[in-house]
Amino acid sequence: MIQCKKEYLIEEKNINSLVTQAKKILNHRKMLYNRYIGKKRTEVDVPLEFYSTNIVSGYFGGKAPEYSIKQENNKKKIKIITDFFNKAIGKNTDAEEFQLLIDYIRDYNDDSSFFYNLVKDYFMTGACYGLTYETKDNEIVYTHISSLQCVAIYDYSAPLQKIGLLRVWQELDNDGFNCNMVEIITNDSKFYYKNSKLQPNEYKLDKDMSEKITWKLTPAFAVENVDNLAIFEPVISLIDSYQQIIENNRNIFQYNDDAKLMITGYRPSNEMFIQDPDNPENNIINPERIKEDEIYLKSKVFYTDDTTGKIEWIIKNINDTASENHKKTLMELILMTICVPNVTDVGFTNADNSSALEKKFFPLEQAIIQADKQFKKELLAMWENIVDRIN
């Protein structure tokens, strides 16, 4: 979230400052996205971010919200509202016709995909965005846009009012160089700015692309987590610890797989090092010793000259019980903190009725209450904007 006055937002000289603020937010979201897709720069990747995001997104966003139009017929209630707010309701309205219009707009916008993509972005990066616009055929379109490009802009009022949306992305200019494109959308304008290779911190208005628009509200859907957190962000350190245990065990297994053979009570026929024929001052590994070692390694039976001799592999022992208990504790802490059920545990697989399953998902329902309220508020604002546009 960025806060400023609308007058500040539309001044060309302020664009670099706004982009700088936005990039700090977007870089953090990029880090979260990289964790989700498994780019952690480690040899072993435990995709708990992927698991938790998909479970919560499917639970909350698997079914798009339903909209119903209510036509008020209670004359007493109509009179009270009309007198109190000086606003007529229920006049010249047809609920069925209006419902058909809403359903038609939802159908051609693929409302279920739009909603799910928003939800997934929200839980993955802590924010989600969409744009609303009218086509040349006078169709109202709302579409999802990546949270890796956008930041909502609010004023200083209480409650906060959304006054714009800033979107930034990279594209090639006419000379083949990367430049930053900036789009700022308000309820009455779309401004486009871009920088150049020679002046990366100076953004110039593109008058040809910029245009005036007419909307009651900013035609942008924006839900940002009030704590700026993705669903898995509070447990990143625990996930890293869990991953470290698995990586440590993997390294030990690899070490044991490549273990050295220790032989006592026997002396090989050939020395390990001999003088380099080409450079007498240096020693080299004796090739005959290598051959001798290979013969003994491949041999099924080996005899030592000394009765006290023995043969054994130099390996590291793993305390498997302690390792598994530590992993189990970490997994329980991770899933408990983010309120995501473990669908592989015995309690979940043995839940043979809907009541038992509901108990498993009860913590998750509590965790998404805030998101539910935020989405409902923003969806109602989006439809208020669309209805006002139609009227």
What are these regions (language model features)?
Residues 211-356:
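Extended, charged amphipathic alpha-helical segments
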Residues 129-231:
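Extended, regular secondary-structure scaffolds
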Residues 59, 72, 84-88, 92, ...:
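Generic structural signal for hydrophobic core residues of well-folded globular domains
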Residues 119-124, 155-157, 173-174, 250-254, ...:
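A general structural signal for short secondary-structure junctions and capping/turn motifs
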Residues 112-118, 319-391:
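C-terminal amphipathic alpha-helical
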Residues 12, 95, 105-113, 120, ...:
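Generic detection of long, well-ordered alpha-helical segments
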Residues 1-39, 200-234, 242:
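N-terminal start-of-domain structural block
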Residues 1-144:
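Extended, helix-rich architectural segments
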